[in-house]
Amino acid sequence: MFQHTTVLLKEAVDGLNVRPDGVYVDCTLGGGGHSEYLLSRLSKRGKLFAFDQDETAILHASERLARYREQVQFINRNFRFLQEELSALGIHAVDGILFDLGVSSPQLDEPERGFSYQHDAPLDMRMDRKQRLTAAEIVNRWPYEELVRIFFRYGEEKFSKQVARKIEEVRRKRPIETTGELVEVIKAAIPAPARRSGGHPAKRIFQALRIAVNDELEAFREALEQAIELLAPGGRVSVITFHSLEDRICKETFKKASESPPLPPGLPVLPDDYRPVLKIITKKPVVPSAEELERNNRARSAKLRIAEKQ
């Protein structure tokens, strides 16, 4: 069953200042929780475009949102194609855009998807199952230097070199084909004292592989730039991140867009080109309440940032 506990539901959607007849985009449909709440705030004239590159997510969410079928349109593509897809539909400005960058719990919990170090399954990790690159391809074919780079950059794993070296050693004898096999390789590479602290020893490596397989950070960077461009004046963007790499991209993009470029001296009036594009609404990120964390432990690392188009 495709069930997913939505994180920061009201905070993210209410933060968009929803207008009943507005046009909105949910860039990360997932289980459909944010979309459902947003649609409940729209009139019959309102419209929601919901993106997800996972066909299964769209299938299940379309059932959940069946009563809103006149107001919602599903788009089965990565959100990095936000502008391209909306432009093809004749949409060039919107009133609000939402990103929830967490991996859907069902994707984590379906063993055959290969996202989780808790289950033994084929090394896959593709959000879009039509794409060719898998985690197995990276683990078995990418050179040592590339493995070190992604483990360190995307997983912030301090034992990146040791893990990459151990992978190289093992794959010379036989391919590493399952998540269980990879977990054993990681455990063998990380010193025992480090394995006993800081959560599961495979957590950071699995995060790094998932990000690399799906090109998550670059896709998000591109999509967020497009989202800012698409917003109508007064429109807002809500972004929920789950780790420091995504949060840094969001924070830096918002900061850059909310600053005026350096002004030439002696200008009597501030030209439009020199006005900030965004106003940051959340000076500090919004985090889940104690009550929400009690209901959903997976929300513990969530941060919400909101900005408004000037």
From Swiss-Prot:
It is found in: Cytoplasm. Pfam families: Methyltransf_5. InterPro entries: RsmH, SAM-dep_MeTrfase_MraW_recog, SAM-dependent_MTases_sf. S-adenosyl-L-methionine binds at G32, G33, H34, D52, F79, D100, Q107. The keyword tRNA-binding does not apply. Keywords: Cytoplasm, Methyltransferase, rRNA processing, S-adenosyl-L-methionine, Transferase. GO terms for molecular function: rRNA (cytosine-N4-)-methyltransferase activity. It comes from the Bacteria. It catalyses: cytidine(1402) in 16S rRNA + S-adenosyl-L-methionine = N(4)-methylcytidine(1402) in 16S rRNA + S-adenosyl-L-homocysteine + H(+). One of its GO terms (cellular component) is cytoplasm. GO terms for biological process: rRNA base methylation. Its main location: cytoplasm. The keyword Cytoplasm applies. Its EC number is 2.1.1.199. Belongs to the methyltransferase superfamily. RsmH family. Specifically methylates the N4 position of cytidine in position 1402 (C1402) of 16S rRNA. PANTHER family: 12S RRNA N4-METHYLCYTIDINE METHYLTRANSFERASE, S-ADENOSYL-METHYLTRANSFERASE MRAW. This is Ribosomal RNA small subunit methyltransferase H. The lineage of its organism: Bacteria, Bacillati, Bacillota, Bacilli, Bacillales. The gene is rsmH.
